[in-house]
Amino acid sequence: MVRTSSFVIFLLSSVSIAAAADIDGPLVGPQDAYEVPVEQASGGIVGYVETSYGAAVDSPGDIDADAWDLRGAVNFDAGAGFNLQVDLGYTRASFEDIDTNSYDGALHGYYRNDLFAAGVFVQGARLDPGIGLDLNDYMGGVEAAYFLDTWTLHGAIGYGQASVEDFDDIDADHYMGSLGARIYATDNLRFDVDGSLHRMSENDLDYDLRSVKLTANYRLDAFPVTLFAGYKYTNEELSGLSDSVSGDTSTLFGGLRFSYGSTTLKEEERLGPVWSSNRLAF
């Protein structure tokens, strides 16, 4: 039973170094605490579509790993501060001679005003590791954001379960926490820092995925196109049965975002999709 039940944890740990370009980040310094909240108008329908590519530059065993990502998000302003955001994503990752495909989606229902946003989310992800078995991961949780003139602080916590199809006795608990900051140098130049923790637990096995990511975003003045690039550090640890295995991965990534319904990078966040995907980066 231990060998069978550990399969879902092993499967997660063996395919989780695919690069992702979600925009989250941790706390900023106390010098920003005296800024006043920014006023904003109703947003209507605002969204974006983005594509990115990432490659591991340092990984356990020097594994040759890279991934490309296609993602989209749209926000619907229902009036009176209530909003609905929908996310969809696809990732294709390569590890040596193995190709994996993952699909994910999320639905966010929340309230937003000039000072803060708060709500709930549900999400699902499906991983096809190319070995005839698919892994499904479902999660729900709460999220919140706080707006000032030149920065946004946001975070989320969630709980869900991961399972392997055709193996009814394999279910891992999935715990997630994230904290992020978006810092605006101008309305079209933003720097993001994000941190997240995912824990998968089943029986006596725990799989922890800790990540920190730095991202620079620049939106062109003449066109609704944003260029972004950054660095992501990931630490993975598989523990249990009186032993543990861990490894670190460094990833460089870059991409393009095509926006609609907004005129600046800052307006896109304040009136459009404010939440990042909380998925496990397979």
Model-predicted regions and their roles:
Residues 79-86, 113-120, 150-155, 187-193, ...:
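Repeated loop/turn-to-beta-strand initiation elements of outer-membrane beta-barrel proteins
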Residues 54-60, 89-97, 116, 123-133, ...:
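Sequence/structural signature of outer-membrane beta-barrel proteins
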